[in-house]
Amino acid sequence: FLSELGYGSLAELVTVNKKFKAEGNPLTPAYRYHKRLHEEQQQMLEQTGLKHLYPDMKEFYLEQQHVHGTANKRMIEAIRSNPHMDGYCVHALTGGDWILGAGLLDLWRNPKSYAYEATKAANQDRIVSIRTLPRNVYAQKGTSLNITGINDLDSVDTYYEITIQSQTGDIVFKNSFKTNWKSGISPLFSQKINTDQWSGHYSVRVKVKDNNNQLL
């Protein structure tokens, strides 16, 4: 059992602090911490010459939360794909004390955008974990595509559709098959992919449907 996993990100401090000033008590330590954090983040961007990348501080905080969600999702998928693990605890639903960036909810108990949504998605009863190895692919060397199914419910007959798309939407790889998605952890697909003619960024997408053509 893994007692604690989780990345971190700041809340969207522009809105949080504005609401706290209007509706909360600005004398509380929590408000002072968040106000100081926001001011220090602004100073840091200016001092490092990176302010032009984030003229809107909201976008800076939301991008942090996207990294937070992406990391949480990958860690949860890894743990749930490991047959030697019986469970895990996500740290944390709310941030507080000296761990202000750990929470999936902000000071007002509002979800922290993608940090919350990605963690929630990775905790669904049925998920597929998609891995390409290596993550950064040299065209001449190819890549290995591995898809693992994690099913905490009953077994179900399923239809899988796997596609790899370029940034422009061109489909460069496609495969489909039917199988019984068993309860537990199942290796669903593994194949070496020829990438000789590829260049740029590509995304792997997997659709899983039941016999009633409903997405799972």
Residue ranges and their predicted role:
Residues 1-159, 167, 171-173, 179-181:
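Substrate-binding clefts and catalytic carboxylate motifs of secreted carbohydrate-active enzymes
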Residues 158, 196-216:
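Terminal connector regions
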Residues 169-198:
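Intrinsically disordered, low-complexity Pro/Gly/Ser/Thr-rich segments with frequent PxxP/GP/PP motifs
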Residues 47, 124-125, 191-200:
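Extended interaction regions within the primary functional domain
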Residues 141-145, 188, 203:
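Short, solvent-exposed loop/turn segments enriched in Ser/Thr/Gly
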